[in-house]
């Protein structure tokens, strides 16, 4: 994942401001949005670094970047470099199911947890130090690295040849395909209900997940329009690579520990 996508949310007036919310506002009025937030957006990890709004070269998405010569606190996760493709594969292959579950649960709850820090916590202290370790790995050389994450509620879905933690509020439907594979279809939860991506789930993995995802409609009908019309609202977090095929994005859940779904 590019470094430009590291900040998926920030702090504004001591509250969480999601990047996808900021992005929607930006594309309604670019200059007004820049003026409103100039100098007001802070790093969500340490709240010591101011962030600026920048537009990607495709003119269809934004990212947040630290002001020049600004410095994160020593333990801030946003100070770290992103883990490499190989480091991510090794980490997620070896992660225990318990830690994986806590990590995915945390990212689904994180927006709430960070809004209300303990009353005795200094706002310049690292926020949620212990929980923040959920998003770090230590490689074989003892170097700590940042685990890349991306909101499903941003304007653009992107390919990724390395493992990324995706999360967000969306609509879900399961299509049962040939050879006992299942496909978790993810749609936007907005007026467009656009098809975001499809996650292939092999039958042996699906069986482990059946209790958690049994509220999601499952049919053998592979028609995308049918899937969208019958989809249900949920919050989801998963870890996968993403490949673009034709006009659709595809991923795969290789282990039950790498998917968490919460019914809304």
Predicted segments — roles?
Residues 1-109:
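N-terminal cysteine/histidine-rich coordination modules
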Residues 15-31, 153-156, 202, 218, ...:
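Short, solvent-exposed coil/turn linker segments
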Residues 49-50, 71-76, 190-198, 244-250:
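Short, surface-exposed beta-strand/loop "edge" segments at domain boundaries and coil↔beta transitions
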Residues 39-42, 62-66, 180-189, 251:
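Generic recognition of long tandem-repeat/solenoid scaffolds
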Residues 47, 170, 242:
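A broadly conserved detector of short glycine/acidic/proline-rich loop/turn motifs that flank catalytic sites
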Residues 91-234:
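Charged linear interaction tracts used for macromolecular binding and regulation
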Residues 228-264:
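OB-fold/S1-family single-stranded nucleic acid-binding modules
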């Amino acid at each position: 994942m590019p470094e430009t996508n590291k900040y998926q949310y920030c702090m504004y007036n001591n509250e969480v401001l999601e990047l996808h919310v900021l992005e929607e506002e930006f594309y309604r009025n670019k200059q007004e949005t820049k003026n409103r937030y100039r100098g007001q957006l802070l790093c969500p990890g340490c709240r010591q670094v101011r962030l600026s709004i920048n537009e990607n070269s495709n003119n269809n998405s934004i990212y947040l970047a630290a002001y020049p010569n600004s410095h994160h606190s020593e333990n801030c996760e946003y100070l770290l470099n992103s883990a490499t493709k190989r480091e991510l594969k090794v980490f997620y292959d070896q992660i225990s199911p318990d830690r994986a579950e806590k990590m995915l649960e945390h990212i689904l709850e994180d927006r709430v947890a960070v809004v209300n820090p303990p009353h005795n916590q200094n706002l310049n202290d690292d926020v949620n130090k212990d929980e923040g370790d959920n998003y770090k790995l230590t490689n074989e050389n003892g170097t700590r690295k940042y685990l890349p994450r991306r909101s499903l509620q941003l304007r653009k879905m992107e390919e990724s040849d390395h493992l990324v933690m995706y999360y967000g509020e969306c609509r879900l439907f399961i299509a049962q395909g040939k050879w006992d594979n299942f496909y978790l279809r993810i749609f936007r939860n907005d007026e467009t209900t656009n098809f975001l991506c499809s996650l292939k789930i092999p039958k042996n993995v699906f069986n482990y997940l059946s209790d958690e995802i049994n509220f999601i409609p499952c049919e053998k009908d592979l028609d995308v329009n049918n899937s969208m019309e019958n989809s249900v609202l949920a919050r989801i977090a998963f870890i996968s690579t993403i490949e673009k095929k034709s006009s659709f994005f595809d991923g795969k859940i290789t282990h039950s520990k790498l998917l968490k779904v919460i019914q809304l």
